[in-house]
Curated annotation (Swiss-Prot):
Gene3D superfamilies registered for this protein in UniProt: Expansin, cellulose-binding-like domain (2.60.40.760), RlpA-like domain (2.40.40.10)
Main localization, broad class: secreted
Name under which the protein is recorded: Putative expansin-A26
Function: Causes loosening and extension of plant cell walls by disrupting non-covalent bonding between cellulose microfibrils and matrix glucans. No enzymatic activity has been found.
Location(s) in or outside the cell: Secreted, Cell wall; Membrane
SMART domains: DPBB_1 (SM00837)
Similarity comment: family membership: Belongs to the expansin family. Expansin A subfamily.
GO cellular component, one term: extracellular region
Domain Expansin-like EG45, first and last residues per copy: 76-186
Domain called Expansin-like CBD: residue spans: 196-275
Keywords carried by this UniProt record: Cell wall, Cell wall biogenesis/degradation, Membrane, Secreted, Signal
Length: 279
């Protein structure tokens, strides 16, 4: 009887192991036909996890395009940057779906994107872009739910899309990863608002690219925490006109830099100031 029990037990273990091992043979990273060979992918990190800000792993998503070849319709946008050519972003931009946009906190983040697993439409190589806009969900649709949660989706400028896929594809599977942003010159601070409501757009941010905290300081006070208004516009109701201003900026990877004496005492609204240094 004991021998029979052992045989049943061993057979049961073999069944369990078979159920566990077989699905593993269908993992990510396989090349289908003559498709562009893609890197291995991992489970996407939580968008609020700063430790994953520059996670080197690749993740699955999809991509489409919007605007024309000259960047029409890609200017302005939900990150508040305005003229992307004047601000140094140019055509290397994308609008992010809700799952990636993180209520604007991802604005300024940089990604590398490649088309994968679709040999009919994919082109070799990759593009590097900055997140500058939001691709809104359309909850009335039942198909082509590109930017609806929980989809991870990049709506690229047409110029960037054509570097990785053919125009007629429309939408393609891609893999993406966060990369450090490489920017020329210092971080820029553009003033908006009025004497009782100072709003500062911060752009041209290197390193992680996206901002987690901002503080402002005039010569006679300590650091004042600013609130994110929308995109990368940060505000304070403290009256700071007539004072020279410095800024303390923390990016999502936890790096903090102080930008001393960015704005002179006679600064005005609608002006842009160079922070001189970058991440």
């Amino acid at each position: 009887m004991k021998l029979l029990e052992k045989m049943i037990y061993v057979e049961f273990l073999m069944i369990i192991m078979a159920m566990w091992v077989v699905p593993m043979s269908y993992g990510h990273g396989a090349m289908i036909g003559n498709a562009v060979e893609a890197p291995d992918v991992a489970e996407a990190p939580g968008i609020n996890d700063p430790s994953k800000a520059l996670d080197p792993n690749w993740y699955d998503a999809r991509a489409t395009f919007y605007g024309d070849i000259h960047g029409g319709d890609t200017q302005q946008g939900a990150c508040g940057y305005g003229n992307l050519f004047r601000q140094g972003y140019g055509l290397a931009t994308a609008a992010l779906s809700t799952a990636l946009f993180n209520d604007g906190y991802t604005c300024g983040a940089c990604y590398e994107i490649m088309c994968t697993r679709d040999p009919q439409w994919c082109l070799p190589g990759s593009v590097k872009i900055t997140a500058t806009n939001f691709c809104p969900a359309n909850y009335s649709k039942t198909t082509d739910l590109w930017c609806n949660p929980p989809q991870k989706h990049f709506d690229l400028s047409l110029a960037m899309f054509l570097k990785i896929a053919k125009y007629k594809a429309g939408v393609v599977p891609v893999r993406y990863r966060r990369i450090p942003c490489s920017k020329t010159g210092g971080v820029k601070f553009e003033t908006k608002g009025n004497p009782y409501f100072l709003m500062v757009l911060i752009y041209n941010v290197g390193g992680a690219g996206d901002i987690k905290y901002v503080q402002v300081k005039e010569n006679k006070t300590g650091w004042i925490t600013m609130k994110k208004n929308w995109g990368q516009n940060w505000t304070t109701s403290t009256v700071l006109t007539g004072q020279g201003l410095s800024f303390r900026v923390t990016t999502t990877d936890g790096i903090t830099k102080d930008f001393w004496n960015v704005m002179p005492k006679n600064w005005g609204f609608g002006q842009t100031f160079d922070g001189k240094i970058n991440f």
